[in-house]
């Protein structure tokens, strides 16, 4: 494909147009009085949202240079969302303000490289101050307050606080559709995975169509169970104790399945067979998780273990196992706490090292099943559009609350940035264009607070001047229009969200200012209209 190239000021202005189009669309959503944006969809109903990254993803501009500028800002929103789960609009507003301030100085003759260094040094200093100003999350009410701000709904904030209080920081909170109106919260006790019994003949509770095993043996194998001889040997081991048996295997088929079913029907011994969850290496890892949780040993060819020669030391134990058509829950596994803690530490390390969002999500689920638990928030609404929008807001609020637990809280409403910058400005000692770069940050840092004020119907400049005279931690509560102690009022932002927004915005601003040429794809001319078909004249 042919390329077109622009240089210097012309290149930067082309990109700036795209940045402004995207940022001006996104920033109307900022703050408690922010507006919604309607996103048209090729198929299905339109989406109504106030989530910055969702809006940014939908914007695709026609001009190639504007498109490149918009894509750079999309990266700011996406990266902030990936790291913190919120703060995408704040990051976009900061990036726009930093770029405008910076380009003004580049046009006036400042050195872009020195400006970039100044921006980075000032941003790093402000981030350090934000971290030192952080207040740890100590109460359920603090979690509820920060989740309420993110979701814009007190009921959602309370449900998320209850969920995280129950499952812990390592637990997983998932959001699902509900077939009735409103919010419901459900908790999973023990380790649950999405595989049910292989045969309905294993059911012990006909009313609920579940199989419940009390104090069972648990046999885990990475291979298939197909041979009748294997089942006979396993049955001999189990029948001595009189305990029920759960078999988790790649599959149970051949002669093995009818043998198990026949023994169950005759009452010889109570057993349930289920397929192991996952595929490939992930299946092996999940089986090992189960083994550690229950004190079992995975029967595997790799370890030289065969089903026809095992003894009862390979069995795991749990207080109860509940198996339905679609899922299995292991309650109170008998594994060593030390072994479980070591496995949890290993999975945490894998999460930190992983660069794949999908892998991190799956590892987090495994971690929750071992260390925490799983809470499910079920969302129902009057229309599909409303349910989809509410579900998305709740997912963001969950990540926001977890970010608060991780690094602590700051006063919200853009105040923490303004006050941290004022403290840092007194101590930053830079010269020349680096000092100019730092000044760009100290001016641009006001943009989120100004935008929140404007969206709430106040003058941004007046609010900034007022906040500068207030004690640390006090500012405008845009929801009520009052100036007050924001931490006490429950108007907070997670440190992780605020610092990620600033760091990512500063990074993209530096790239903008140091761009000297832009190479874009040349737009293809529209295809000529098809010639009329003479046979269509009838």
Swiss-Prot record:
Single GO MF annotation: ATP-dependent protein folding chaperone
GO biological process: protein refolding
Pfam families recorded: Cpn60_TCP1 (PF00118)
Matches recorded under SUPFAM superfamilies: GroEL apical domain-like, GroEL equatorial domain-like, GroEL-intermediate domain like
Reactions listed under catalytic activity: ATP + H2O + a folded polypeptide = ADP + phosphate + an unfolded polypeptide
UniProt-annotated location(s): Cytoplasm
Signal peptide extent: none
Main location: cytoplasm
Annotated InterPro entries: Chaperonin_Cpn60_CS, Cpn60/GroEL, Cpn60/GroEL/TCP-1, GroEL-like_apical_dom_sf, GROEL-like_equatorial_sf, TCP-1-like_intermed_sf
EC number: 5.6.1.7
Binding site for ATP: 29-32, 86-90, 413, 477-479, 493
GO cellular component: cytoplasm
Record keywords: ATP-binding, Chaperone, Cytoplasm, Isomerase, Nucleotide-binding
Protein's UniProt keywords contain tRNA-binding: no
Subunit description: Forms a cylinder of 14 subunits composed of two heptameric rings stacked back-to-back. Interacts with the co-chaperonin GroES.
Similarity comment: Belongs to the chaperonin (HSP60) family.
Described purpose of this protein according to its UniProt entry: Together with its co-chaperonin GroES, plays an essential role in assisting protein folding. The GroEL-GroES system forms a nano-cage that allows encapsulation of the non-native substrate proteins and provides a physical environment optimized to promote and accelerate protein folding.
HAMAP family: CH60
Protein known as: Chaperonin GroEL
Gene designation per UniProt: groEL
């Amino acid at each position: 494909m042919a390329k077109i190239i622009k240089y210097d000021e012309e290149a930067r202005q082309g990109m700036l147009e795209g940045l402004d189009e995207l940022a001006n669309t996104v920033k109307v959503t900022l703050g408690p009085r922010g507006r919604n944006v309607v996103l048209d969809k090729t198929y299905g109903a339109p989406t109504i949202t106030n989530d910055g990254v969702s809006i940014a993803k939908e914007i695709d501009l026609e001009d190639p240079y504007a498109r490149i500028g918009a894509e750079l800002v999309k990266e700011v929103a996406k990266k902030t969302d990936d790291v913190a789960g919120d703060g995408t609009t704040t990051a976009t507003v900061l990036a726009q303000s930093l770029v405008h301030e910076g380009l003004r100085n580049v046009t006036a003759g400042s050195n872009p490289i020195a400006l970039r260094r100044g921006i980075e040094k000032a941003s790093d200093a402000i981030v350090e101050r934000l971290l030192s100003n952080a207040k740890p999350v100590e109460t359920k009410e603090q979690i509820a307050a920060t989740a309420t701000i993110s979701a814009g709904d007190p009921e959602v904030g309370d449900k998320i606080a209850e969920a995280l209080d129950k499952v812990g920081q390592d637990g997983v909170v998932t959001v699902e559709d509900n077939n009735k109106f409103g919010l419901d919260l459900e908790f999973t006790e023990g380790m649950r995975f999405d595989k049910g019994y292989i045969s309905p003949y294993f059911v012990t509770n006909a009313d609920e169509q579940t199989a419940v095993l009390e104090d069972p043996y648990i046999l885990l194998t990475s291979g298939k169970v197909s041979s009748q001889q294997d089942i006979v040997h396993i049955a001999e081991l189990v029948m001595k104790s009189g305990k029920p048996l759960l078999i988790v295997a790649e599959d149970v088929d051949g002669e093995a399945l009818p043998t198990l079913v026949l023994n169950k029907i005759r009452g010889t011994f109570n057993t349930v067979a289920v397929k192991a969850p996952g595929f490939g290496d992930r299946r092996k890892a999940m089986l090992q998780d189960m083994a550690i949780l229950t004190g079992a040993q995975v029967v595997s060819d790799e370890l030289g273990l065969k089903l026809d020669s095992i003894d009862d030391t390979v069995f795991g134990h749990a207080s109860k196992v509940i198996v339905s058509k679609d899922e299995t829950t292991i309650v109170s596994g008998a594994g060593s706490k030390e072994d479980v803690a070591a496995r949890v530490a290993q999975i945490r390390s894998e999460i930190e090292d992983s660069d794949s969002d999908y892998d991190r999500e799956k590892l987090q689920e495994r971690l929750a099943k071992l260390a925490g638990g799983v809470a499910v928030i079920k969302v129902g609404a009057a229309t599909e559009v409303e349910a989809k929008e509410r579900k998305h807001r709740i997912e963001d609020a969950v990540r926001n609350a977890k970010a608060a637990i991780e690094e602590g809280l700051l006063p919200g409403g853009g105040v923490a940035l303004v006050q941290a910058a004022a403290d840092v400005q007194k101590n930053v000692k830079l010269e020349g264009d680096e000092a100019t770069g730092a000044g760009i940050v100290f001016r641009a840092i006001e943009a989120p607070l100004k935008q929140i004020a404007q969206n709430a119907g106040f003058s941004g400049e007046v609010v900034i001047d007022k906040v500068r005279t207030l004690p640390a931690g006090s500012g405008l509560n845009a929801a009520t229009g009052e100036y007050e102690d924001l931490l006490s009022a429950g108007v907070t932002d997670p440190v992780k969200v605020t610092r990620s927004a600033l760091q990512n915005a500063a990074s993209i601003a530096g790239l903008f200012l140091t761009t000297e040429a832009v190479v874009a794809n040349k737009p293809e001319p529209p295809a000529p209209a098809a010639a009329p078909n003479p046979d269509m004249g009838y």
